[in-house]
Amino acid sequence: MEEGDFFNCCFSEISSGMTMNKKKMKKSNNQKRFSEEQIKSLELIFESETRLEPRKKVQVARELGLQPRQVAIWFQNKRARWKTKQLEKEYNTLRANYNNLASQFEIMKKEKQSLVSELQRLNEEMQRPKEEKHHECCGDQGLALSSSTESHNGKSEPEGRLDQGSVLCNDGDYNNNIKTEYFGFEEETDHELMNIVEKADDSCLTSSENWGGFNSDSLLDQSSSNYPNWWEFWS
């Protein structure tokens, strides 16, 4: 046998083997594929039961014309996809809740800052009147003390003098009132007294004879008749 014929025979055998393997793979792939009816029935079973017992797997495989291994693999893949979908849903819900809470936190943080600033402003406004009142009270007390000291130092002596003068005047008035009450007459006016004095001087200067005839008893009698009981006052 020639060398070229040998290589041709080997190549033909290899190619035939490859074609046989391809056919087997196609058959296996056809066996693995599921029809739409099989998939729908498997989906309905999965909604009620996510895991099947061995007896249940055999029963489902017979009903659908599949092998029990195919049913087990399909349920296994379906559970994995279902878990990933559930995790995605939970993650999306948690992410939405987190974003909502984060936005609320930012809003509350801003409100807190505004409230803190407002509280500081109110505290400052409350402290200002207290300080002003304190200064006003201190100023009023200082003025009152200074005015009281000045009035005490400047007006004590004149007031004392005035009080002494008023006491003396009151004593004089009291004595005059006593005299008028006991003697029974009031003081005459200055004009009347001057007239009496002038008449007395004229009478004394013109008539010297009257000096000799001056009777002291008559004067005493007249004064006693006009002003009775005047000695009782001095007794």
UniProtKB/Swiss-Prot annotation:
Alphabetical list of Gene3D superfamilies matching this protein: Homeodomain-like (1.10.10.60)
Organs and tissues of expression: Widely expressed.
InterPro entries, alphabetized: HD (IPR001356), HDZip_class_I_plant (IPR045224), Homeobox_CS (IPR017970), Homeodomain-like_sf (IPR009057), HTH_motif (IPR000047), Leu_zip_homeo (IPR003106)
GO molecular function annotation: DNA-binding transcription factor activity; DNA-binding transcription factor activity, RNA polymerase II-specific; transcription cis-regulatory region binding
Induction: By water deficit, by abscisic acid (ABA), by cold and salt stress.
Spans annotated as Leucine-zipper: 87-122
Listed GO biological process terms: positive regulation of DNA-templated transcription; response to abscisic acid; response to osmotic stress; response to virus; response to water deprivation
Basic and acidic residues bias: start-end ranges: 128-138, 152-162
Any Gene Ontology CC annotation: nucleus
Keywords assigned by UniProt, alphabetized: Activator, Developmental protein, DNA-binding, Homeobox, Nucleus, Stress response, Transcription, Transcription regulation
Location of region: Disordered: 128-167
Location within or outside the cell: Nucleus
Residues within the DNA-binding region(s): 27-86
Keyword presence, Transcription: yes
SUPFAM superfamilies found in the cross-reference section: Homeodomain-like
PROSITE patterns, A to Z: HOMEOBOX_1, HOMEOBOX_2
Alphabetical list of PANTHER family matching this protein: HOMEOBOX-LEUCINE ZIPPER PROTEIN, HOMEOBOX-LEUCINE ZIPPER PROTEIN ATHB-12
Entry function: Probable transcription activator that may act as growth regulators in response to water deficit.
Family classification: Belongs to the HD-ZIP homeobox family. Class I subfamily.
Subunit structure and binding partners: Interacts with TFIIB1.
Name listed for the protein in its UniProt record: Homeobox-leucine zipper protein ATHB-12
The encoding gene: ATHB-12
